[in-house]
């Protein structure tokens, strides 16, 4: 019974050790660049909402 706290502490330490397969994301990584590109595309689409509704009737149905 006295080894239980030691076992729990060891499990917590093992879980907190970073593994070799984990890689930090930088601004040059493709997933992050894709994320920012998608955000810009969505913001551009939302800002063009008025123009879309003026020129295309079907577009207003989505808004």
UniProtKB/Swiss-Prot annotation:
One Gene Ontology cellular component: extracellular region
Species: Conus gloriamaris
Comment on protein domains: The cysteine framework is V (CC-CC).
Family: Belongs to the conotoxin T superfamily.
A Pfam family per the record: Chi-conotoxin
Annotated protein name in UniProt: Conotoxin Gm5.1
Tissue expression profile of the protein: Expressed by the venom duct.
Signal as UniProt keyword: yes
GO-annotated molecular function: toxin activity
Signal sequence residues: 1-21
PTM note: Contains 2 disulfide bonds that can be either 'C1-C3, C2-C4' or 'C1-C4, C2-C3', since these disulfide connectivities have been observed for conotoxins with cysteine framework V (for examples, see AC P0DQQ7 and AC P81755).
Propeptide segments, given as residue ranges: 22-50
Primary location: secreted
Intracellular or extracellular location(s): Secreted
Keyword terms, alphabetized: Cleavage on pair of basic residues, Disulfide bond, Secreted, Signal, Toxin
């Amino acid at each position: 019974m006295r080894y239980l706290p030691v076992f729990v502490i060891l499990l917590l330490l093992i879980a907190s050790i970073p593994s070799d397969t984990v890689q930090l994301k930088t601004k040059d990584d493709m997933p992050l660049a894709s994320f920012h590109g998608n955000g810009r595309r969505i913001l551009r689409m939302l800002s063009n909402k008025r123009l879309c509704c003026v020129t295309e009737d079907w577009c207003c149905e989505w808004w």
